[in-house]
Amino acid sequence: MDLLLLLKAAIMGIVEGITEFLPISSTGHLILASELMNFWTKEKSAVFVVAIQMGAIAAVIYEYWSRLWGAATGMVTGEEKGRHLAISLILASIPIVLVGLSFGQTVKDLLFNDVAVAIGLIVGGVIIMWIEKNPPKVNAVEVENIGLKQAIWIGLIQVLSLIPGTSRSGATIIGAMFLGVSRKAATEFSFFLGIPVIIGAGLLDLYQSHEVLQTSFDWSVLGVGILVSFVSALLLIRALVAYVAKRDFMVFAWYRIVSGLLILLFAYTGWTIW
């Protein structure tokens, strides 16, 4: 058993769990962490990243099980709040499904590199700053108050997250705030919206990578990454909800900009850790 590889897997799990739901681009950080640590082969690393995202999204399902179950059953029972939330999530998921299936692989082939991630981080940071300095009037305080038109627009904005470094969470949270959704509701809606998007994209990626899974694959490495991702994501979700109740996202804007500049530096110097 390669203990160093297990350690790297745990670090990747922590990176995924912490960054998946923050507006700072989990994909960008995972690409950077993988390259800095020379983590696994390119093919195995890609499968690993998809798998640990499942661990992070499982944390959302665990934390919000009662509300999500209410949304699922609301489609059958007709309970108003649950049904409205379910329809909102479905509508918001459609754009990225259509665009992702049509152009997702093309985007990966062209833009999955350090420079693209850095640019996405910097541009996103500037947009977050602008939104926080010019906050729109809030018209949806809770997730259940988000209108169907707002949900559709959030879904359209989420398509931008196909670009590495943009951040799915960043696009949906800031997009929702721009449309008048409260910071807390925008954050929780982003959590929920990640469930169909990440699971759907993940299953598709795993299916397309079945040849890699059939080779000599170290499943213990995968297990460590998923478990660590789940635990770290669960802790992050609880901390973030408490954070946004009192503070804004300006610190993340600065983080994105500084991180983007550092990634550009690493990209042009070829610096690695191990």
Swiss-Prot record:
EC number in record: 3.6.1.27
Residues spanning the membrane: 4-24, 45-65, 84-104, 111-131, 146-166, 186-206, 217-237, 249-269
Q: What would be an example GO MF term here?
A: undecaprenyl-diphosphatase activity
* Gene Ontology biological process terms in this record: cell wall organization; peptidoglycan biosynthetic process; regulation of cell shape; response to antibiotic
Q: What else is known?
A: Bacitracin is thought to be involved in the inhibition of peptidoglycan synthesis by sequestering undecaprenyl diphosphate, thereby reducing the pool of lipid carrier available.
Q: Which organism is it from?
A: Acinetobacter baylyi (strain ATCC 33305 / BD413 / ADP1)
**Entry membrane topology:** Multi-pass membrane protein
Q: Which reaction does it catalyse?
A: di-trans,octa-cis-undecaprenyl diphosphate + H2O = di-trans,octa-cis-undecaprenyl phosphate + phosphate + H(+)
Record's family? Belongs to the UppP family.
Official protein name in the record:
Undecaprenyl-diphosphatase 1
Gene behind this chain?
uppP1
Role this protein plays:
Catalyzes the dephosphorylation of undecaprenyl diphosphate (UPP). Confers resistance to bacitracin.
GO cellular component annotations of the record: plasma membrane
